[in-house]
Amino acid sequence: MRAFIVGRWQPFHKGHLEIIKKISEEVDEIIIGIGSCQRSHTLTDPFTAGERIMMITKALGRYNINYYIIPINDIDFNAVWVSCVESLTPPFDTVYTGNSLVRELFSEKNYVVKKPELYNRKEYSGTEIRKKMLKGEKWEHFVPEEVVDVILEIDGIGRIKRLDEKDYDDYF
């Protein structure tokens, strides 16, 4: 059996890792969708699709998990989004999502949809991790060490801080 899960993975953290590991116990292969792949260089989506692929690939490297990583664009046309996903991915039977819209769209197309159990959601939140990065607080223990390496390699902290800078034009 092959399953699909989509997320923004901004950044890929230990909560995401636990969900992927749990799904891998239930299916033979996982298709990991890089959602909103066209978005990057913003405070909510600071990392590119390629950087997120690096994070996930390196973090999963030590596990015996069969997976594909597929970038998925936002198309702002919900009625055809599932068809778009289907055209980009290998066939799959099951969708794992905690997102109510994604759940509804795939359910309407008769997919088996499961809601993964979130792993310590208060602690493992991309939003909170990005806030810690911005404030100069400790964030490294929330993500796999391979993700720390990628973020340091691409100067992800510097990028987030630069994105938060205010230009003089903002004050006039």
From Swiss-Prot:
Major localisation: cytoplasm
GO biological process: NAD biosynthetic process
EC number(s) on file: 2.7.7.1
Catalytic activity annotation: beta-nicotinamide D-ribonucleotide + ATP + H(+) = diphosphate + NAD(+)
UniProt pathway annotation: Cofactor biosynthesis; NAD(+) biosynthesis; NAD(+) from nicotinamide D-ribonucleotide: step 1/1
GO molecular function, one term: nicotinamide-nucleotide adenylyltransferase activity
Class in the EC hierarchy, top level: transferase
Stored Pfam families: CTP_transf_like (PF01467)
Gene Ontology terms: cellular component: cytoplasm
Compartmental location: Cytoplasm
Record-linked SUPFAM superfamilies: Nucleotidylyl transferase
Keyword annotations from UniProtKB, A to Z: ATP-binding, Cytoplasm, NAD, Nucleotide-binding, Nucleotidyltransferase, Pyridine nucleotide biosynthesis, Transferase
InterPro entries documented for this protein: Cyt_trans-like, NMN_Atrans_arc, Rossmann-like_a/b/a_fold
Family (UniProt): Belongs to the archaeal NMN adenylyltransferase family.
The protein's name: Nicotinamide-nucleotide adenylyltransferase
